Curated annotation (Swiss-Prot):
Belongs to the phosphatidylserine decarboxylase family. PSD-B subfamily. Eukaryotic type I sub-subfamily. Residues 50-60 are mitochondrial matrix. Keywords: Cytoplasm, Decarboxylase, Lipid biosynthesis, Lipid droplet, Lipid metabolism, Lyase, Membrane, Mitochondrion, Mitochondrion inner membrane, Phospholipid biosynthesis, Phospholipid metabolism, Pyruvate, Transit peptide, Transmembrane, Transmembrane helix, Zymogen. The gene is Pisd. This is Phosphatidylserine decarboxylase proenzyme, mitochondrial. It comes from the Eukaryota.
Length: 406
């Protein structure tokens, strides 16, 4: 019967008929029923049944190739985007930034970066065995391009833990402070952006801004100010400008992990007020600054405000991932990345007291504070209209080198 059925099927095919004879259809149905029955049977020990597994199960058995393919494809796409951006930059074309959406920012902020940074801070303070110090520090030096010939102590065995290594001191002659210009760089780093502050918006990187008032917070109490405040009806920018004919300027310096982590006074000025903003600790590298609007307003930061010979002056140290610890040498009450402080609040401290009517005087180049790893310094200050920056965006700069002058 099977043979005749097979012949009937062959005759049908040879005859060019597009239908199958009933015996062939019967065999096909029976075969499918038999295979379906096998799939429903439980697997027995020592019996392999891979030939009856559905396609869905085969993919579940191989997640690694799928993840590698997906991740590789995304990485390739990102590399193509970077290559395209570099080509456009070489042609002199401006590349509009691609900002993160609200849900992307919220998702990133939900990552426990403060907790992770506290854990990293404690890990950095663990004393390393003497024999392990050289290989660990050498790996860090090689990875981030640290120049140890500038360090006051070049012997790697001298640094008991990573925290001491990050905060290493420099040789006195390693960073001469420029005396010809009125404003010098407070730290080593990379210039992200600089220029005049217009319409109460500050440029984070080219094409991405943040609110001046959100960044600095509301004006301090009038008794803390060394100069009378402007009318409350003025814009926030105009409230900071104290002298007619002056402008408000800004400069953003990004400190990479391999840079010198201390920061110094950029000019001769008097600090009258400190404001601490607990916040997130998102990465502040230039790529993230191009992606997240008002990144510096989201992150934890310490704002020092006061005055210099031309009016208002401020220096802000912005925290980042694994950089929850910001230290100001003369402020022992400051405790950053502390679980007792909640996001969205701020803590004020006035350095103007009955015993000290002026505040804390700082000389240009004098040590001011330090990070435990790379981060960002933002300068916002008042100066006459003929103030000129001697910079270009993206350039590397070292502590003590000129930022600008009149």
């Amino acid at each position: 019967m099977a043979a005749s059925g097979g012949r009937a099927c062959v005759r049908s095919l040879r005859g060019g008929v597009l239908w199958r004879s009933s015996p062939c259809h019967y065999e096909s149905t029976a075969t499918r029923h038999f295979l379906g029955t096998l799939q429903k049977l439980p697997l027995q020990a020592g019996v392999r049944n891979f030939h009856t597994a559905p396609v869905r199960s085969l993919f579940l058995l191989r997640p690694v190739p799928i993840l590698l393919a997906t991740g590789g494809g995304y990485a390739g796409y990102r590399q193509y985007e970077k290559y395209r951006e570099r080509k456009l930059e070489k042609l002199g074309l401006e590349i509009p930034p691609k900002l993160a959406s609200h849900w992307e920012v919220s998702l990133y902020k939900s990552v426990p970066t403060r907790l992770l940074s506290r854990a990293c801070g404690r890990l950095n303070q663990v004393e390393l065995p003497y024999w392990l110090r050289r290989p660990v520090y050498s790996l860090y030096i090689w990875t981030f391009g640290v120049n140890m010939t500038e360090a006051a102590v070049e012997d790697l065995h001298h640094y008991r833990n990573l925290s001491e290594f990050f905060r290493r001191k420099l040789k006195p002659q390693a960073r001469p402070v420029c005396g010809l210009h009125c404003v010098t760089s407070p730290s080593d780093g990379k210039i992200l952006t600089f220029g005049q502050v217009k319409n109460s918006e500050v440029e984070q990187v080219k094409g991405v801004t943040y609110s001046l008032e959100s960044f600095l917070g509301p004006r301090a109490n009038t008794e803390d100010l060394p100069f009378p405040p402007a009318s409350s009806s003025d814009s926030f920018r105009n409230q900071l400008v104290t002298r007619e004919g002056n402008e408000l300027y800004h400069c953003v310096i990004y400190l990479a992990p391999g840079d010198y982590h201390c920061f110094h006074s950029p000019t001769d000025w008097t600090i009258s007020h400190r404001r601490h903003f607990p916040g997130s600790l998102m990465s502040v590298n230039p790529g993230m600054a191009r992606w997240i609007k008002e990144l510096f307003c989201h992150n934890e930061r310490v704002v020092l405000t006061g005055d210099w010979k031309h009016g208002f002056f401020s220096l802000t140290a912005v925290g980042a991932t694994n950089v929850g610890s910001i230290r100001i040498h003369f402020d022992r009450d400051l405790h950053t990345n502390s679980p007792r402080y909640s996001k969205g609040s701020y803590n004020d401290l006035s350095f103007v007291t009955h015993a000290n009517k002026e505040g804390i005087p700082m000389r240009k180049g004098e040590p001011l504070g330090e990070f435990n790893l790379g981060s960002t310094i933002v300068l916002i200050f008042e100066a006459p209209k003929d103030f000129n920056f001697r910079l270009k965006a993206g350039q590397k700069i070292r502590f003590g080198e000129a930022l600008g002058s009149l």
